[in-house]
Design a protein with these regions (language model features):
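Active-site donor/metal-binding and catalytic loop motifs
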Residues: 233-247
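Juxtamembrane "helix exit" motif at the C-terminal ends of alpha-helical transmembrane segments
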Residues: 296-320
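Active-site-proximal specificity loops/subdomain of glycosyltransferases
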Residues: 5-23, 27-31, 35-37, 41, ...
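Juxtamembrane C-terminal module of membrane proteins
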Residues: 21-22, 268-281, 311-411
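Long helical/loop segments within the catalytic core of UDP-sugar-dependent glycosyltransferases
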Residues: 64-109, 113, 127, 133-212, ...
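Catalytic donor-sugar/metal-binding loop of nucleotide-sugar-dependent glycosyltransferases
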Residues: 220-237
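Short beta-strand-to-loop acidic/aromatic patch adjacent to the donor-nucleotide binding site
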Residues: 112-124
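A short, conserved beta-strand element in the Rossmann-like catalytic core
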Residues: 124-125, 217, 238-239
Length: 411
């Protein structure tokens, strides 16, 4: 007997909803006429979607009020800082580089610091990486002075052009599978997902603020001066890849030019065993200039063969049928592997930017079929660095890589 009639309850709820909606609409119309709503929305957006700097400042202020909580510091590099470790202010503007900023930040480290981790602003490290770093530091502090992990630059996958998507996938494959082997021949250090002993940073003089690849330069210098060879860190971090070919080319051109700078610098260190310098320089040349040229030459083989065949200058029957089937099979394997890489690293993608329509998702998959053209373009920035350096026109200024906007979380 005490139960209300369902239709009566629904009618009450409907009337209440209409009443509330009308009052809200009236308030919004009134506020829009007076301009009051503009300020309210602006303040609401600033509170809901803070910038990275605002979040850091907020966390730093909260941590400062709690005893026993790790300190958070947010520092700005002075415009006139000379860039050297323990350097000085010159009173005049100094070009900005990543190495310069890192050296300024080292000054704010707690003297008790044993190891320093480096990440980019948009990095998302593995949640267990610090546990592993601490474990290695306790088990073998000498061999774990430099720990370098893989970086999967695929998170803004859906915001990239098709070429950059393919490049990002194969960059992730290289870091995932090839990086452990690379450590057998090169003391490779990347600029992110790397942990370096604090005392080693001080002993070798911090980061070089003049070369374009301060990370690779640090790895070679730490090895030659202190015998510190990087160890593979089996925990990945996800980041972004430049979304357009222009930005991609500029970043890779900087990497290639920086590599050439390191090759030239390796022999300039004093009080270092000359044989070690020569061996390291040879390894850098093999992994750099030689591989770039061979890869670029290999990309010319298919188009040259097509032109020769079209001009009746090459007989296709010279290749046995089994060989032709094998070549066709390789093409299918490469395309299949590209789709496998897409699925393998899908957990690291920002899926909030994935197209909602089936047509949009279909276009993403179809873009992966541009692999043959993309593969031709992969080595172009590096061979361009070779050509420009030979002409004395290589880039000399460090340029920050543009980032794409990511989904913002409510703080």
């Amino acid at each position: 007997d005490g139960l209300a009639h369902p239709f009566g309850s629904q009618d009450i709820i409907r009337r209440m909803t209409d009443l509330i909606a009308k009052r809200v609409c009236q308030a919004v119309r009134k506020a829009s006429r007076t301009g009051e709503i503009r300020d309210k929305i602006r303040h609401a957006l600033l509170d809901l979607y803070p910038t990275t700097q605002e979040v850091v400042d907020r966390v730093a202020s909260e941590a400062a009020q709690k005893p026993g909580v790790p300190a958070v510091r947010h520092v700005v590099v002075p415009y006139d800082f000379d860039g050297a470790l323990n350097g000085k202010k010159t009173g005049r503007p100094v070009p900005s580089t990543k190495g310069r900023a890192l050296n300024w930040g080292i000054n704010y480290l707690d003297p008790r610091t044993e190891v320093v981790g480096f990440y980019d602003a948009e990095s998302r490290p593995h949640k267990d990486v610090l546990l592993y770093v601490g474990y290695r530091r306790m088990m073998d502090p000498e061999k774990s002075r430099v720990l370098q992990g893989p970086v999967f630059q695929v998170r803004n996958f859906y915001q990239m052009t098709p070429f950059c998507r393919i490049a990002a996938l194969y960059q992730a494959v290289a870091h995932d599978w090839y990086l452990p082997w690379l450590f057998r021949t090169l003391p490779f250090v990347g600029g992110t997902n790397v942990f370096i002993a604090h005392d080693l940073l001080r002993e070798v003089g911090g980061w070089d603020c003049h070369v374009l690849t301060e990370d690779l330069e640090f790895g070679t210098r730490a090895y030659l001066l202190r015998g510190a060879w990087p160890e593979y860190l089996p925990y990945s971090s996800s980041e972004q890849t430049p979304p357009t070919f222009k930005a991609f080319f500029r970043q890779r051109l900087r990497w290639g030019t920086g590599h050439l700078q390191v090759v030239d610098k390796v022999l300039t260190y004093k009080d270092v065993e000359r044989s070690a310098q020569r061996r390291l320089r040879l390894s850098l040349i093999i992994k750099g200039q030689l591989e770039w040229v061979l890869y670029q030459l290999a990309t010319f083989v298919p188009p040259i063969a097509m032109v020769l065949h079209h001009q009746d200058l090459m007989d296709a029957t010279l290749v046995p049928a089994a060989g032709q089937w094998m070549l066709s099979g390789f093409s299918a394997i490469y395309l299949g592997f590209t789709f496998y890489a897409f699925r393998r690293y899908s957990a690291h993608l920002d899926n909030s930017c994935c197209p909602n329509s089936w047509l949009g998702r279909f276009c993403v998959y179809m873009g992966l079929f541009l692999l043959p053209l993309a593969a031709f373009m992969f080595p172009v920035p590096y061979t361009s660095a070779l050509v420009l350096k030979s002409m004395g026109k290589e880039p000399k200024a460090w340029v920050k890589t543009p980032r794409t906007e990511e989904t913002r979380a409510v703080s």
